[in-house]
Curated annotation (Swiss-Prot):
Keywords: Ribonucleoprotein, Ribosomal protein, RNA-binding, rRNA-binding. Signal peptide: none annotated. The lineage of its organism: Bacteria, Pseudomonadati, Pseudomonadota, Alphaproteobacteria, Hyphomicrobiales. GO terms for biological process: translation. NCBIfam families: S20 (TIGR00029). One of its GO terms (cellular component) is small ribosomal subunit. Disulfide bonds: none annotated. Binds directly to 16S ribosomal RNA. It comes from Methylorubrum populi (strain ATCC BAA-705 / NCIMB 13946 / BJ001) (Methylobacterium populi). Belongs to the bacterial ribosomal protein bS20 family. This is Small ribosomal subunit protein bS20. GO terms for molecular function: small ribosomal subunit rRNA binding; structural constituent of ribosome.
Length: 88
């Protein structure tokens, strides 16, 4: 248990930051899931539209430190490859 005023404040700040990070991570995962569901249906147009919406969300999560920049780039790249493979 925090005893000092500064430690109590840090506990509050950490709780607030954790809630924000959890929300952002959840939002990113939701957009990724929408792309994956569109890929599963086999509709390339719908999958491409979902990817165009998801890509900025994934990169925004990286910008805020939710995931590493390389991790975000890899996610986008792999999703794009899967969307592209639908046509083949």
């Amino acid at each position: 248990m925090a005893n000092t005023v500064s430690a109590k404040k840090m506990t509050r700040k950490i709780a607030k930051r954790t809630a924000i990070n959890r929300s952002r991570r959840s939002r990113m995962r939701t957009f990724v899931r929408k792309v994956e569901e569109a890929i599963a249906t086999g509709d390339q147009g719908q999958a491409l539209a979902a990817l165009r919406v998801a890509e900025p969300e994934i990169m925004r999560a990286a910008q805020h430190g939710i995931v590493h920049k390389n991790n975000a780039s890899r996610k986008v790249s792999r999703l794009a490859a899967r969307v592209k493979a639908i046509a083949a």
